[in-house]
Design a protein with these regions (language model features):
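Flexible glycine/acidic-rich beta-alpha junction loops that bind and position SAM and/or redox cofactors
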Residues: 127-131, 235, 267-268, 290-295, ...
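Canonical Radical SAM [4Fe-4S] cluster-binding loop centered on the CxxxCxxC motif
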Residues: 171-206
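N-terminal [4Fe-4S]-dependent radical SAM core
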Residues: 123, 129-178
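Conserved SAM/AdoMet-binding glycine-rich loop
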Residues: 33, 210-318, 325-355
Length: 419
């Protein structure tokens, strides 16, 4: 907390006192398709959407941060004055300190000063040239010699990670206090933004961060969520489980992010079941060992089956699997392998509720698969899985192919999307 700032937040269910004239107006974006909410909010505040139209009046500086902006800020360049690249723990403070130095200055002076902060990108101070009208980006050059030619995203090296500041029934995860257990992922699947964008893999200190945060959060809610791309690979995860197994936490409901199959033990399943968790989630991507080797998903079908057996033995009622179609190298035989694996699972763990949520591969910047496109065959492949799994009593939940295409445009697009 800083005593030199007055911070107001926008919610759907409560109102905090809002300033008559905001100086800084910030957004954090974790998913490409949330972009529409940004425009809605700006319009509701009668703030012009495009940065070039915010020069005539005393409009706030519009800034953005989070994984979507860090991965590829260019589609948002025409709408934002400032984009913060990387982890915000330290970067946000440096940004505010620089702004205080030029608080009363003209906007162009403010932006030039802010451009000197490592990790701060001012899109209007850079000129983009392309290889022809519809070609690739040829260069992104500063318009002035005093503007940094190269920007470096910022990486937080501490061992105290984030936790919820708001708990509400209106959130995506209703009334859950979320605690970030790890950041990044050591597995390095070739499609995964969470691995490559947020390197290195970091874990929160058990005694210094996790336990104090959990204790505080459980004073306002009885629902706890452990967040991270690879939660069960925290080096002290067993100790964390032991802490949450204490009798004083018998009445809490524990939720956990997607876990790796080789960490699904009967002990883990029992603890989750005793904390009112009905199921766990495992990202398998495909039932094909061959395709998983291509994408560097270090996982075998035997491990998936054993994880399901352990989950049932520990008292869980179901498993949710994440899958993907349209991955580079995917053939029709790989879809058949997914069907076969799911049906084998159904026989191996009768009574365990199985569901498969399946999305279309979307290329992400900074990953080895960033140069692949969205496979136009993906929509038919989703329908193929849907037809053959639902007829066998498997809960199949496909994501919209059309929205995946839009997500891919934002993930790999540039400023021309705003023309």
């Amino acid at each position: 907390m800083r005593s030199d700032l007055q911070v107001s937040r926008l919610f759907t269910d409560i109102n905090e006192p809002l300033p008559k004239q905001a100086e800084l107006f910030g957004f954090s974006l974790s998913w490409e398709l949330d972009y529409v909410n940004i425009f809605d909010i700006l319009e509701s505040w009668e703030i012009p959407i495009r940065a070039k139209n915010r020069c005539g009046k005393n409009y706030p500086i519009i800034f953005g941060g989070g994984p979507v902006f860090t991965a590829n800020p260019e589609p948002f360049a025409d709408f934002f004055d400032v984009i913060l690249l990387g982890d915000g723990e330290n970067l946000l403070g440096y940004f505010i300190e620089a702004y205080k130095e030029v608080r009363g200055a003209e906007k162009q002076v403010q932006l030039k000063r802010l451009s000197q902060v490592p990790g701060v990108y001012i899109p209007s101070l850079y000129e983009v040239t392309y290889e022809g009208t519809n070609g690739a980006i040829k260069s992104i050059e500063p318009i002035d010699k005093d503007i940094p030619a190269v920007l470096q995203k910022q990486t937080y090296r501490g061992n105290s990670l984030s936790a919820s500041t708001v708990v509400t029934e209106k959130a995506a995860w209703e009334n859950i206090f979320m605690v970030e257990v790890v950041r990044s992922c050591p597995e390095m699947c070739r499609f995964c933004l969470a691995s490559y964008l947020t390197l290195p893999f970091r874990s929160a200190s058990l005694e210094g961060s996790l336990i104090p945060a959990i204790a505080k959060g459980l004073t306002v809610t009885k629902r706890l969520g452990l967040l991270g791309a690879s939660v069960t690979q925290h080096p002290e995860f067993e100790s964390l489980l032991d802490y949450l197994s204490q009798s004083k936490y018998d009445d809490i409901r524990l939720s956990i992010a997607s876990v790796r199959t080789n960490t699904v033990t009967e002990k883990l399943a029992k603890i989750l079941a005793n904390r009112d968790t009905k199921s766990i989630t495992i990202a398998i991507e495909s039932g094909s060992d061959r395709l998983r080797r291509i994408i560097n998903k270090k996982l075998e079908n035997e491990e998936i089956i054993q994880a399901a057996i352990n989950a049932k033995a520990g008292g869980l009622k179901g498993i949710k699997f994440y899958g993907m179609v349209g991955l580079p190298g995917e053939e029709s035989e790989d879809l058949d392998a997914t069907l076969e694996m799911i049906l084998t699972l159904k026989k191996a763990v009768p009574g365990l509720r199985l569901s498969l949520g399946c999305s279309t591969f979307v290329p992400k910047s900074h990953t080895p698969f960033q140069w692949f496109g969205v496979n136009y065959r993906s929509e038919k492949r989703l329908k193929f899985l849907e037809k053959n799994l639902r007829s066998k009593g498997i809960d199949f939940r496909p994501e919209s192919y059309k929205w995946s295409v839009i997500q891919g445009l934002i993930s790999r697009g540039d400023r021309r999307l705003s023309f």
